Amino acid sequence: MILEYIVTGNEMKLLDDTTSQVFLVPSVVLMEQAAAGVVRELVACFDKSKEFAVICGKGNNAGDGIAIARLLNQAGYRCMLYYAFGTDEAGSELFELQKNIYARYGFKVVSDIECVCKSDVIIDALFGTGLKRAIEGSLADVISAVNKANAYRVAVDVPSGVDSDKGHVMGCTFKADFTYTFSYKKTGLLLWPGCDYCGLVKVVPIGIDDHSFCGNLPSVRALDESDLKKLDNRPAHSNKGTFGKLLVIAGSRNMAGAAVLSAKAAYKSGAGLVKIITPECNRSIIQCALPEALLCTDITSAKALETELDWADAVVIGPGLSKSDNAKMLVETVLKTAEIPLVIDADALNIISDNMTLLNEHKMPVIVTPHLGEMSRLMKKSIVNIQEDIIGVAGEFASLYNVTCVLKDFRTIIAAADGEKFINLSGNCGMATAGSGDVLSGIVGGLLVQLRDTKKAAAYGAFIHGLAGDMVFDNTGSYGMIASDIIDGLDKVWIKVEKNGN
């Protein structure tokens, strides 16, 4: 995979230090390049009729801000500087250097926040990635004032008040229209609620690249559309067996739709053959809705199920399954006897949550796809506690049970047992609809029988699921989207993949 690294505040500080200490690039050079990069973006967006104001703290983020103000003035723009701690407050070494340089030029400094609020563009350089406390008191008053101003708001690296690691909002927080972050996106810019304060996020190169990791690569990454080019083209000399056989164990009385959605999504993701195990009462519905699917009904013994498992290359189990005694038998048999990879979703997870020892029974690679409620039951943690550290919780679960965990939320987190994690950046709020998770399980299962790699199937599956939703958003909007629309969007995704691949 081609991967975009996502870093924490501490990882970014280590990169800064490594670039300076190992590669001998002075910190002030990095700061100047950071400022110049932000100014290039601003000049591309705003003409010289606009007046700028930079609000500064007293750390290195403020140093970036002062350098930005100086470069804007030197480029012929009107820009004022506001020191939130006052002009006499001492700060970091680089802050003091930039402050002195700015003073030598004699560019404008103001002490009245009302002057700042009258400008056209307000740039936040109060706090950077190191902030770990709530913004209160007079600093909160400053941020509150500029948030109310009739101006564009730009954040330098991270909006002040956003935790750069976990996306928490700490006290009064700067509400940006644009965030120019340095070298790599920070995890907190992508997670809720911090992402709501970032506006459009753009990475500004400053001279730090992957060399500065010195082999210690970040554990969190993201996929984008360019990664889809890495999916293999389907060979011309192929048949339905070439693309794998998926067994979907899904549906119960009044829940036939879950089986249809999952199986159809698997077919639409390229699986060669899909067989559904479901109660006999669902037969007519499924055969009408998805005539392409093979059907096996009323499996009521472990022996009968084992025969079907021998047919398949992978299993999806759980969508609409219920928690009946027969459903419990199906889940237990699959976990204890299957010698093929598994995708465990929905009611299968709810059954497991009542007996977590079941998850230690699996012989083959497993992908679990819980939403927050299901993860709460699995981990015996509140949803609030999970949301406070969603990446950490997904990673903990993956490691504890040796599975790949697809933890579904506003930003779905994919965590592998080896410690590698992905943040999915595709998708939209229209996808928060009944059956969306069934579609995801089918996509992941469909990819799994082709890729034979749980990590890739989970990561690509989550991304493609979101991208399919994005593809149909213009037709449905957020109110009108239903799970079947997401399946329709898969056609557009694969057409794009094949065109780009060729």
Which residues are covered by each model-predicted region?
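Amphipathic alpha-helical segments in well-structured domains
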Residues: F95, K99, L139-I143, A176, ...
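Glycine-rich phosphate-binding loop
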Residues: D112, D120-A134, V315-S322, T412
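Small-residue (G/A/S/T)-rich helix-start motifs and N-terminal tracts that mark the onset
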Residues: M1-M80, L189-L342, A346, N350-I367, ...
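Internal gly/pro-rich beta-alpha loop/helix module
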Residues: D120-V121, L126-P218
